Amino acid sequence: MFPVAPKPQDSSQPSDRLMTEKQQEEAEWESINVLLMMHGLKPLSLVKRTDLKDLIIFDKQSSQRMRQNLKLLVEETSCQQNMIQELIETNQQLRNELQLEQSRAANQEQRANDLEQIMESVKSKIGELEDESLSRACHQQNKIKDLQKEQKTLQVKCQHYKKKRTEQEETIASLQMEVCRLKKEEEDRIVTQNRVFAYLCKRVPHTVLDRQLLCLIDYYESKIRKIHTQRQYKEDESQSEEENDYRNLDASPTYKGLLMSLQNQLKESKSKIDALSSEKLNLQKDLETRPTQHELRLYKQQVKKLEKALKKNVKLQELINHKKAEDTEKKDEPSKYNQQQALIDQRYFQVLCSINSIIHNPRAPVIIYKQTKGGVQNFNKDLVQDCGFEHLVPVIEMWADQLTSLKDLYKSLKTLSAELVPWLNLKKQDENEGIKVEDLLFIVDTMLEEVENKEKDSNMPHFQTLQAIVSHFQKLFDVPSLNGVYPRMNEVYTRLGEMNNAVRNLQELLELDSSSSLCVLVSTVGKLCRLINEDVNEQVMQVLGPEDLQSIIYKLEEHEEFFPAFQAFTNDLLEILEIDDLDAIVPAVKKLKVLSY
């Protein structure tokens, strides 16, 4: 569309006016071309032709309207370009803000994850510390129990050893007294031997025969002492029986009782007189069997002859031949055999004397001592005929029976201790080892201590109440058998310890008093959770703000309405400019603008 120039007229004034209008119109068209070129459009050209076939002619009003329309279009395109630029800038800002929010959200999420990991690690450490503390507490309690048991056992052992020490001290004192007594007896015996020997032989003993004679003297002196002791014992018994008889006489209320008691006393006195007469006869026989002075002189002469013969034999040993030596040996064999037999008899006699002294010791048991008395009375008649040691056999047999019965006593005490003290671990007695009285005393002492403790602890509940408590525990904690009671008690104890530790830690964290109840703890934890939730909401509101939230909602709604048109417009621009990226739109438009200039 090109406007046609008007035809020239004849008058000059109208021509001038037309020229000015033409120039003005051309200037307006030039300004419009400039605008079109600025916006990348092709300019319009004014032509001066007479041929009007290919031309469309507008009048002044239509050309003016055309110019106005073009101006409006150009202005609208510029406004749209500005609007697009603003939209691009706002889009970039929104992207930047979105990236910032995403980075903030990622940082917050990372921080929350880190805090969760830290909290989990702290929880695990707290659990480990609680387990360690529980295990240490259990270990310490077990140690304390073991130490208490050891202390009790040591106290028992200490008491036992104290008793043993006192017994040993008593035995040592008695042994010392016995040693002193034996020393004194030995000294007295040696003195009497030497005195009798000096009285008989008028010299000091220095040969083997003298020693044998001393042994013989000792033997007879011991028999004499024994007879004296028996006689004194019988006299004491007779005195005690007479006293008892007098007491019985005093106690008899009637005359018949007095007569009966007198008859009994007469019978007993007759029997005692007979016994004393028999003892007197025995003593007389014993005195008759003793050697006389004449026999002692003969013994001395024989000893002197034997000494001389021995001296001669020693001097003539090298000179006499083998046959004479054999003859002398044959002659000396009976005397040597007699000497050896005498020594053996002497040793046997000493052993029997020591056994007899042990049996007659006052420290011997009472029953055994009484039985030895009876044995002495029974063997009274044969004491002189034999050596007087026949009563030792039944006593030793009875002692052997008592020692064998110790095993039965040990078994019965063991069963009794299993009933009274089942936790006492008794050592298994070896069959080869003998049973000691100390072991039996230890068992009896432990049972007595247990009985005393039971008497002291009289407030202990009955067995039925304890059984009811155990059954109630089984019902409460679902324990089918008694074997599962201790594991379930340990489990309950550990759970209770964990709960107490957790409550204590919460009280320390919340700065509560240790005497505060669980209701107070639960209420404070609930308040803390509510405060934390309110703080989180306030922090979210502080970050985003209530007005920003509403504006973001409005912006999102506007963007939902605006983005489809903007997307279509940008796609058209990308196709026209032949580019693929939104960031390349602005540089391409700038290039076109430069090219248009």
UniProtKB/Swiss-Prot annotation:
InterPro entries the UniProt entry points to: CEP70 (IPR037692), TPR_rpt (IPR019734)
GO biological process: cilium assembly; regulation of microtubule cytoskeleton organization
Domain of life: Eukaryota
GO cellular component assignments: centrosome; cytosol; microtubule organizing center
Record localization: Cytoplasm, Cytoskeleton, Microtubule organizing center, Centrosome
Function according to Swiss-Prot or TrEMBL: Plays a role in the organization of both preexisting and nascent microtubules in interphase cells. During mitosis, required for the organization and orientation of the mitotic spindle.
Subunit architecture: Directly interacts with tubulin-gamma; this interaction determines centrosomal localization.
Domain remark in the UniProt entry: The coiled-coil domains may be important for tubulin-gamma-binding and hence for centrosomal localization.
Protein name: Centrosomal protein of 70 kDa
The organism's taxonomic lineage, starting at the top: Eukaryota, Metazoa, Chordata, Craniata, Vertebrata
